[in-house]
């Protein structure tokens, strides 16, 4: 499923190519690209839920009035999916104002819905980018995240 999300994001959304509204046409194109129907439907449902998150003011996605000094306590299931490196990266993104409490919760929600036994920091970065792309008013945060995703480290790290 994550491969399909990446394919869609890279080929349609991120490249600013007009995405087809017709789900059947899009499904057929994905089948021609080698993806299976079950995984395609899961990926499209994942994207629909992502779009729905920004259209609701139901908590926890919009955490208005929450102090930024509070730490997020992760459930056992979230800890199993998001390792220490991923959780640390989410905290870093909040500290540099790429994410706020509501977008962080959107990211966690979308991560938990990914049907994959393995999830790594690179996958998390793409989910963050997809979430920020879909939230109006987060263009600056999206650009910052894009820089973080595509920047190459300079020199050797010690």
Curated annotation (Swiss-Prot):
InterPro entries linked: Smg
A Pfam family matched in the record: DUF494
Domain of life: Bacteria
Cross-referenced PANTHER family: PROTEIN SMG
Family affiliation: Belongs to the Smg family.
The name this protein goes by in its record: Protein Smg homolog
């Amino acid at each position: 499923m994550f491969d399909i999300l990446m394919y869609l994001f890279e080929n349609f959304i991120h490249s600013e190519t007009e995405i087809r509204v017709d789900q059947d046409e899009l499904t057929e194109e994905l089948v021609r690209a080698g993806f299976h129907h079950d995984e395609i439907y899961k990926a499209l449902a994942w994207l629909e839920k992502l779009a729905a998150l920004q259209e609701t003011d139901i908590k926890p996605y919009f955490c208005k009035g929450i102090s930024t000094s509070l730490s997020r306590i992760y459930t056992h299931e979230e800890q199993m999916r998001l390792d220490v490196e991923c959780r640390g990266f989410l905290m870093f993104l909040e500290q540099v104002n790429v994410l706020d409490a509501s977008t962080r919760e959107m990211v966690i929600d979308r991560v938990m819905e990914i049907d994959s036994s393995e999830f790594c920091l690179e996958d998390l970065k793409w989910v963050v980018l997809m979430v920020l792309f879909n939230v109006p008013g987060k263009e600056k945060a999206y650009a910052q995240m894009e820089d973080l995703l595509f920047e190459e480290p300079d020199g050797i790290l010690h």
